[in-house]
From Swiss-Prot:
The gene is uvrC. This is UvrABC system protein C. Residues 12-91 form the GIY-YIG domain. Belongs to the UvrC family. Keywords: Cytoplasm, DNA damage, DNA excision, DNA repair, Excision nuclease, SOS response. It is found in: Cytoplasm. Interacts with UvrB in an incision complex. PROSITE patterns: GIY_YIG, UVR, UVRC. Residues 203-238 form the UVR domain. One of its GO terms (molecular function) is DNA binding. InterPro entries: GIY-YIG_endonuc (IPR000305), GIY-YIG_endonuc_sf (IPR035901), GIY-YIG_UvrC_Cho (IPR047296), Hlx-hairpin-Hlx_DNA-bd_motif (IPR003583), RuvA_2-like (IPR010994), UVR_dom (IPR001943), UVR_dom_sf (IPR036876), UvrABC_protein_C (IPR050066). The keyword Cytoplasm applies. The keyword Kinase does not apply.
Length: 615
């Protein structure tokens, strides 16, 4: 049956529709209040669809649907199918299968606390999800310090009295129920306290512990009272770090979102008893072109579908398309009413704004990390081309002059693929007469690496602090703006100094554009579309820019200095003449009329300049 024929058979009932590609793979799952209307919209208005939807439809070869009695049932089925199949074109909680949880096996005789990535219907209590495994392990460590419950999988009833205390008992992270160091009743009490702590019920827990401490003291169990006192202090120290963020004592999850072109970051603050008990951020993919409300709705469905706990109130900052339906679904899962609130003023509005700012920061950090990784991958690609493992520090050199005048050299530094401008260096060429780029390059390289040798000796003697050195850090790779002649000039200097560093010339084509790299072993052809090529071009451009800027500065100073020798020419007129003519040669060729046209110049000053260069 064709898609067109199937469209005619769609019922006017709620349900779920399932899009499939030519291999029969599920690529999209959606729900509808009226299946007939929703599914037809896709195929009858293709040109009006978002680009992402157009791409998805180009792969659809078939669809199926499942009728439900209510829209709520459709929502529940949609959540289950998305979780099961993770369709390519659905908005998905990125890598949600990997989010870790803390598991407390309250279904066991002697419960354990452990790390897990799976929620199972086994009667255990689950806390999370957390955004990182490190956060879970650190939290478990903290809980065990205050409530020393076991992590092992021993059969306590069977092993009782047959085993010795493990290391965790001796360092205070386990109460050793396996050796009867603690009776079952007291052990279960510890577990209950740990669960309250993880639930965010810390004020209630402290009150309960204070009552237990008082009772222990009254019964002259002073050692027990002291242990409980230490527990209370530990819990209070963790509670001090929590910010009071809410009015009242309700349980709230506060949700907001920040987005870039290709990904959306959802930040969730978990408020328990009016205090911030934790926060996590998650990423949603396939969100291009979607409204914020759609994305947050998708997050809520996927996040709470398998969540071990649902709060009384969810606060967010955007109207959700399915707000009432989501509230009904969440209420059914929780067992009593769940409110979805979109505040416009007051304390709750301040809270959700704060969550948005945190989402924005998390997204910025993620983008920054991705850029760092991307840069490192480009450096790795370039390093492999020149036979290195990883060229962390690349130095590039260029020479700039005008027919041998105002001769300068530049050194630019790239660390991990990024320019490090604080380590750029300038060189006035002191010992080369006329225009000789090879000799100029030799001078620059020799001075740079002699400085390095001197500074290293001073550092070894303790006469120079390492962070005060300007040249001591050596490059992993050297680039020069030029061909094989420049490369050989540099290699000769390095060889004479006993230094071995790979050197490559950045050669240009006939149109003065970067072409590739050259060394004594020959030229390396690098695809112009590669990221390594773009990095080389960036380094070459930066070395050239830095050299020519320094050259122009030096030229300008010399130019102005010579003009200042002329009667009637001061700083302002010298600058104006430099801006107008750019070189002494042009001024020498200029007529009095040409000179008079320059801003600030008059007949007398123009005549003085004209005569000065014709003495």
């Amino acid at each position: 049956m064709t898609i067109e024929e199937k469209l005619k058979l769609l019922p006017e009932k709620p349900g779920v529709y399932i899009m499939k590609d030519k291999s029969g793979k599920i690529i999209y799952v959606g729900k509808a209040v009226v299946l007939k209307n929703r599914v037809r919209q896709y195929f009858q208005n293709k040109e009006k669809q978002l680009p992402k939807v157009k791409v998805m439809l180009s792969h659809v070869e078939d669809f199926e649907y499942i009728v439900t009695d209510t829209e709520l049932e459709a929502l529940m089925l949609e959540c289950n199918l998305i979780k099961k199949y993770k369709p390519k074109y659905n908005v998905l909680l990125k890598d949600d299968k990997n989010y870790p949880y803390i598991k407390v096996t309250v279904n066991e005789e002697y419960p354990r606390i452990m790390f897990t990535r799976r929620i199972e219907p086994d009667g255990a209590k689950y806390f999370g999800p957390y955004s990182s495994a490190f956060a879970v392990r650190e939290t478990i460590k903290l809980v065990r310090k205050m409530f020393p419950i076991r992590t092992c999988n021993k059969n306590i009833e069977k092993d009782m009295g047959k085993v010795r205390e493990c290391l965790y008992y001796h360092i205070g992270l386990c109460s050793a129920p396996c050796t009867n160091k603690i009776n079952k009743e007291d052990y279960i009490k510890l577990v209950d306290q740990a669960v309250l702590f993880l639930d965010g019920k810390r004020d209630w827990l402290i009150q309960k512990l204070k009552e237990d401490m008082k009772k222990a003291a009254e019964e002259l169990r002073f050692e027990e009272a002291a242990r409980i006192r230490d527990q209370i202090f530990a819990i209070e120290r963790t509670s001090e770090k929590q910010k009071v963020v809410s009015v009242g004592e309700d349980e709230q999850d506060i949700i907001s979102m920040a987005r870039s072109a290709d990904i959306s970051c959802i930040q969730v603050f978990f408020v328990r008893d009016g205090k911030l008990s934790g926060r996590e951020h998650y990423y949603m993919k396939n969100t291009e072109g979607m409204e914020r409300g759609e994305i947050i709705s998708s997050f809520i469905k996927q996040f709470y579908e398998g969540a071990p706990y649902i709060p009384k109130e969810i606060i967010t900052d955007v109207e959700l398309d399915e707000s009432e339906l989501l509230s009904e679904w969440l209420s059914q899962k929780r067992g009593n009413k769940v409110f979805i609130t979109i505040p416009v003023r007051g304390k709750k509005k301040e809270l959700v704004d704060m969550v948005y700012q945190n989402a924005l920061e998390a997204l910025k950090n993620d983008i920054s990390i991705r850029e760092e990784i991307s840069k490192a991958q480009v450096v790795l690609e370039l390093s492999n081309l020149v036979g290195l493992d990883y060229a962390k520090r690349i130095e590039a050199y260029d020479i700039s002059n005008t027919r041998g005048q105002d001769n300068v050299g530049s050194m630019v530094v790239f660390v991990d693929g990024k320019p490090k401008k604080s380590q750029y260096r300038k060189f006035n060429i002191k010992y080369v007469e006329g225009q000789d780029d090879y000799e100029s390059m030799r001078e620059v390289i020799e001075r740079r690496f002699l400085h390095a040798i001197e500074e290293k000796e001073l550092i070894e003697k303790g006469e120079l602090e390492e962070d005060k050195a300007k040249f001591a850090e050596m490059p992993d790779l050297i680039f020069v703006d030029g061909g094989i002649g420049h490369v050989n000039a540099v290699l000769q200097v390095l060889s004479g100094l006993g230094i071995s560093i790979p050197v490559y010339g950045m050669v240009k084509d006939s149109k003065h554009r970067t072409r590739g790299l050259v060394s004594p072993q020959g030229e390396i052809d690098i695809p112009m579309t590669s990221k390594a090529f773009r990095l080389i071009a960036q380094i070459q451009e930066e070395a050239h820019r830095f050299a020519i800027t320094f050259h122009k500065e030096k030229q300008s100073k010399r130019f102005k200095s010579e003009l200042l020798n002329i009667p009637g020419i001061g700083e302002k007129r010298a600058k104006a003449l430099y801006d107008a003519f750019k070189s002494i040669e042009e001024i020498k060729r200029a007529s009095v009329e040409d000179l008079k046209k320059v801003e600030g110049m008059n007949e007398k000053a123009a005549q003085a300049v004209y005569e000065y260069f014709r003495k």
